[in-house]
């Protein structure tokens, strides 16, 4: 192969380009060129699936490129790689329809300043096909090899009525491309971008955001309200805040599950870290800083899904999200959270006179299953939320401890608990999503039952726990059980606010665990 041909082949792909291997695996090109000890030119690929890789970009001790995930790199020849396509080509190939703007095809007439439109064979059928696209409001382009966005107005002319678009598992590689796409889809309401690897180049992004094309398309026309970004390599929260501020100003729901996010206290937008505005006066700087606060970045956000990340600090979440005015749902399942605290008091405005926190003021649903919360005092804190009525709280250490505590309690009537479990069978089945209804393990049933008994009394306004409704009878039974377990009839001043509240509803219990224990000790003497 000649040097000229070799060069053209190497330049066929570029660094950062998203490609498919001949086995269907998807990766990003991190290197192109020679590899010592091997003939020809090679592409260094970082695969999305680490199992597809063989090394860290190192061959015989020499580092050619680096990988985020351990062992996700390998080298490939160009013959083994599949290049992406434009949005319109991938869509038209999928539906076997050729889409072109035939109205722009003309030839010059012999008469001055007159052009004659070309009449293409089959053009009427093509226009009919275009009408079908234009009528579409939902389009799934998931797994298509889309790597480029067509110039305006090609996408607009064919898909301007789209309301929902799924571009998950494609080959797009930058947020600049997404800006270019959104300008042509003014009616888009819901966008899926899962399992893409979108880079963020500040200069390119700003240039595309601030530009209007000859057809008048602007990013201000974007109307996306629901954004799904599962496993999209968005661990940097500054990027999240920047794209939402400039692209998704009307966003109501964001799913950022499985992005390796560790903290979310970096709300300052990347775009304001440059020095373009060095001459701004002090008032303008203060105003700009205020606009970086969460309530300004996400004024319409109602639902945020941060499940399956590595978040450890609830305080980070509180300081960053606690003042969002519209937030009603927060999913923190499968993280590393160990505690829950609400800062401040009545004097600093963070708490109301009734002891409720003014943070997360409109939060109705919070999901905290599969975290590392190991003390009931942190769960008690959730009762300070003004609007909370639904909670998910499975598989935390404090829940697992219930069964151990119960098994060591000599005063526990085992048969009574078994009967209660049988009587509450419907709630138990709902709590397990109706899976394996007739084959539940007794240990799991008991854990679920004890979990509900210990959580429901602590959260007075809770209406749903672990996807199961809380009935009035269940709440009464749970609160009476809670009084039996925790009420101090000997020294009533040691009873906390929650116990005194339950006493005001149900009255002072005749028998408690403490009184029965004392009676047993007296009888023993």
Curated annotation (Swiss-Prot):
Ranges: LRR repeats: 300-321, 326-347, 362-383
Domain of life: Eukaryota
Residue ranges of coiled coil: none
Record-annotated LRRCT domain positions: 441-481
Keyword Chaperone applies: yes
InterPro entries tied to this protein: CAP-Gly_dom_sf, CAP-Gly_domain, Leu-rich_rpt, Leu-rich_rpt_4, Leu-rich_rpt_typical-subtyp, LRR_dom_sf
GO terms assigned for molecular function: alpha-tubulin binding
Matches recorded under Gene3D superfamilies: CAP Gly-rich-like domain, Ribonuclease Inhibitor
Record region (Disordered): 414-444
Domain CAP-Gly: 33-77
Function per UniProt: Tubulin-folding protein; involved in the second step of the tubulin folding pathway.
Subunit structure: Supercomplex made of cofactors A to E. Cofactors A and D function by capturing and stabilizing tubulin in a quasi-native conformation. Cofactor E binds to the cofactor D-tubulin complex; interaction with cofactor C then causes the release of tubulin polypeptides that are committed to the native state.
Similarity remark: Belongs to the TBCE family.
Descriptive protein name: Tubulin-specific chaperone E
Lineage of producing organism: Eukaryota, Amoebozoa, Evosea, Eumycetozoa, Dictyostelia
């Amino acid at each position: 192969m000649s040097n000229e041909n070799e060069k053209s082949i190497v330049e066929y792909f570029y660094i950062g380009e998203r490609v498919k291997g001949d086995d269907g695996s998807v990766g990003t090109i991190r290197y192109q060129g020679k590899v010592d000890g091997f003939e020809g030119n090679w592409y260094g690929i970082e695969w999305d699936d680490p199992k597809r890789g063989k090394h860290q970009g190192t061959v015989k001790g020499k580092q050619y490129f680096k990988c985020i995930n351990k062992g996700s790199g390998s080298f490939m020849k160009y013959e083994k790689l599949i290049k992406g396509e434009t949005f319109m080509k991938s869509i038209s190939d999928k539906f076997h329809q050729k889409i072109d703007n035939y109205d722009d095809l003309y030839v010059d007439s012999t008469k001055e300043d007159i052009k004659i439109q070309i009449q293409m064979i089959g053009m009427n059928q093509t226009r009919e096909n275009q009408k079908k696209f234009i009528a579409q409001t939902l389009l799934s382009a998931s797994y298509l090899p889309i790597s480029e966005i067509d110039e305006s107005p090609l996408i607009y002319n064919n898909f301007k009525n789209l309301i929902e678009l799924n571009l998950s598992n494609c080959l797009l590689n930058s947020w600049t491309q997404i800006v270019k796409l959104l300008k042509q889809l003014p009616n888009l309401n819901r966008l899926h971008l899962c399992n893409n690897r979108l880079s963020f180049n500040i200069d390119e992004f700003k240039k595309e955001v601030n530009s209007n094309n000859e057809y008048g398309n602007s990013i201000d026309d974007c109307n996306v309200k629901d954004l799904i970004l599962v496993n999209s390599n968005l661990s940097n929260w500054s990027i999240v805040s920047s794209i939402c501020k400039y692209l998704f100003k009307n966003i109501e729901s964001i799913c950022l599950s499985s992005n390796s996010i560790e903290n979310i206290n970096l709300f300052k937008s990347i775009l304001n870290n440059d020095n373009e505005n060095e001459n701004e006066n002090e008032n303008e700087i203060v105003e700009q800083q205020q606009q970086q606060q969460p309530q300004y970045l996400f004024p319409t956000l109602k639902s945020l899904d941060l499940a399956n990340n590595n978040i450890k600090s609830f305080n980070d979440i509180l300081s960053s999200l606690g003042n969002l005015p519209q937030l009603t749902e927060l999913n923190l399942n499968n993280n590393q959270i160990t505690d829950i605290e609400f800062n401040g008091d009545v004097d600093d405005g963070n708490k109301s006179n009734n002891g409720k926190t003014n943070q997360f003021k409109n939060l109705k649903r919070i999901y905290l299953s599969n975290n590392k919360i190991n003390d009931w005092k942190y769960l008690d804190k959730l009762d300070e939320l003004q609007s909370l009525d639904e909670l998910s709280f499975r598989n935390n250490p404090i829940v697992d401890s219930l069964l151990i505590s119960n098994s060591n309690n000599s005063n526990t009537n085992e048969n009574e608990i078994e009967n209660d479990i049988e009587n509450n069978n419907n709630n138990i089945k709902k709590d397990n999503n109706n899976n394996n209804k007739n084959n539940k393990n007794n240990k799991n049933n008991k854990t679920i039952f004890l979990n509900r008994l210990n959580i429901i009394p602590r959260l007075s306004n809770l209406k749903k726990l672990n996807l199961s409704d809380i009935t009035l009878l269940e709440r009464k039974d749970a609160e009476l059980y809670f009084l039996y377990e925790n009420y101090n009839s000997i020294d009533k001043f040691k009873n906390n606010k929650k116990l005194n509240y339950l006493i005001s509803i149900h009255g002072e219990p005749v028998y408690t665990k403490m009184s029965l224990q004392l009676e047993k000790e007296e009888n023993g003497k």
